[in-house]
């Protein structure tokens, strides 16, 4: 995914901004010397330009702290972080996927940051980042940035059909408009049968969940009335196009399908629009974005919030410097800059206006205010590895009895989530 880079700002101005919002003395210096805070950030989470600007500004504002950032690859990062937390040479700050925090916290390898929430404006954090950053009642992950799915649509096809996306305030209005678009060789929507993150949003809209916990034991919840209603809506929407019922958005890549020119809309992160244009330059300027509509007017659809949290290993050599680093990077000034630079959703709802001029990011921000995460337990990783949710969706879309298939999938989820208990 390609992102727009942040325009350069002088180090002097940056340092002044940092000084104005800095956390003050952190006690991290080593006997009057300079402390080096070791940081692991993930590939492409920030641009090289942003990383340089932040590092220079931070070090100018905090002359007793040097920043050493190591870029990590997503492939295999779970095992690498687990190994680092178990050793004696862990970095001071680690960027972790928001849904990964629970498994690292369960191991006892993370520092409990609960007493720093107020200092870090925790009351305003996006729920989809803050909730998975907590485990067993304690806050381990500090929300860093978010991204979620929106509707990417063809402006010209919507206009030709007389559909105004601004008027699609409910799911039923969305269905009616998509039905109108689904004619004359145009797919109203390309929705593959196994886009389970989208299904999760519809389930949450109905008041349901993928799984629930009681007395320390997790239970699959796809067979509840609420979850079944979410699946029923997914089936209605999926039928208004030619998306395959037995695969997800990667097989075939849905951006490439949309680039062929016969698809009116897809559910994707805004970055998917860049891939569409790369595959068909004639569509440049013809793509727009709107939040996934909700069940009722005035409330956008629930979405799965992807993104990252920042954590501090329990074995970190410089925890005070680590917290100073985190406070700056997750504070107002740098969150606004990061959001503009990378088309992200900032970590707090009050900062959403920072991306008002970015159509894709602003559509994400509307949805992110109603964001959720997958069940906050290490056991969910086993569910995703098998992914009975995908099999359930295909079974229903190909004629299976929804209640029976949901019961089977829920049993599989229950088994997977409790396998290690």
Language-model region placement:
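Short, low-complexity disordered leader/linker segments with a strong preference
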Residues: 1-38, 60, 414-421
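Extracytoplasmic "Venus flytrap"/periplasmic binding protein-like
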Residues: 57-125, 160-162, 257, 261-265
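A structural signal for short loop-to-beta-strand junctions that line the ligand-binding cleft
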Residues: 91-92, 121-157, 187-188, 299-302, ...
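Hinge/lid segment of periplasmic solute-binding proteins
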Residues: 98-148, 175, 202, 288-290, ...
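Short, solvent-exposed loop/beta-turn-alpha elements that line the ligand-binding surface or hinge
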Residues: 114-125, 167, 189, 208-229, ...
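Extracytoplasmic/periplasmic solute-binding protein
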Residues: 140-144, 149, 173-220, 226, ...
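Glycine-centered hinge/linker elements that transmit conformational signals in sensory
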Residues: 178-179, 217-247
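C-terminal lobe and pocket-closing loops
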Residues: 270-284, 295-391, 419-421
């Amino acid at each position: 995914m390609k992102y727009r880079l942040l325009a350069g700002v002088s180090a002097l101005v940056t340092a002044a901004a940092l000084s104005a919002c800095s956390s003050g003395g952190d006690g991290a210096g080593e006997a009057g010397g300079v402390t080096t805070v070791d940081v692991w950030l993930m590939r492409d989470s920030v641009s090289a330009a942003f990383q340089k600007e932040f590092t220079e500004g931070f070090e100018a504002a905090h002359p007793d702290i040097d920043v050493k950032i190591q870029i990590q690859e997503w492939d295999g990062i779970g095992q690498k972080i687990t190994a680092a937390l178990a050793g004696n040479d862990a970095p001071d700050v680690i960027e972790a996927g928001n849904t990964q925090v629970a498994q690292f916290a369960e191991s006892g390898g993370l520092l409990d940051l609960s007493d720093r929430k107020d200092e870090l404006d925790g009351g305003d954090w996006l729920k989809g980042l803050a909730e998975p950053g907590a485990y067993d009642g304690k806050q381990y992950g500090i929300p860093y940035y978010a991204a979620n799915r929106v509707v990417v649509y063809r402006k010209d096809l919507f206009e030709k059909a007389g559909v105004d996306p601004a008027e699609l305030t409910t799911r039923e209005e969305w269905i009616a408009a998509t039905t109108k678009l689904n004619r004359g060789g145009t797919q109203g929507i390309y929705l593959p049968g196994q886009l389970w993150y989208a299904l999760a949003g519809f389930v949450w809209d109905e008041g349901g969940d993928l799984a629930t916990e009681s007395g320390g034991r997790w239970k699959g919840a796809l067979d509840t009335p609420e979850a079944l209603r979410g699946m029923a809506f997914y089936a209605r929407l999926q039928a208004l196009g030619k998306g395959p019922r037995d695969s997800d958005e990667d097989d075939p890549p849905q951006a490439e399908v949309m680039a062929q020119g016969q698809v009116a809309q897809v559910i994707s992160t805004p970055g998917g629009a860049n891939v569409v244009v790369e595959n068909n330059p004639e569509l440049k300027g013809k793509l727009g974005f709107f939040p996934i509509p909700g069940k009722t007017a005035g409330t956008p659809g629930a979405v799965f919030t992807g993104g990252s949290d920042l954590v501090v290993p329990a074995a970190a050599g410089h925890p005070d410097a680590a917290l100073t680093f985190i406070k700056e990077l997750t504070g107002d000034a740098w969150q606004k800059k990061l959001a503009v630079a990378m088309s992200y959703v900032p970590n707090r709802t009050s900062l959403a206006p920072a991306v008002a001029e970015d159509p894709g990011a602003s559509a994400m921000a509307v949805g992110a205010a109603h964001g959720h995460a997958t069940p906050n337990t290490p056991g969910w990783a086993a569910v995703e590895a098998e992914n009975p949710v995908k099999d359930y969706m295909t079974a229903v879309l190909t004629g299976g009895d929804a209640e029976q298939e949901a019961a089977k999938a829920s049993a599989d989820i229950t088994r997977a989530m409790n396998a290690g208990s």
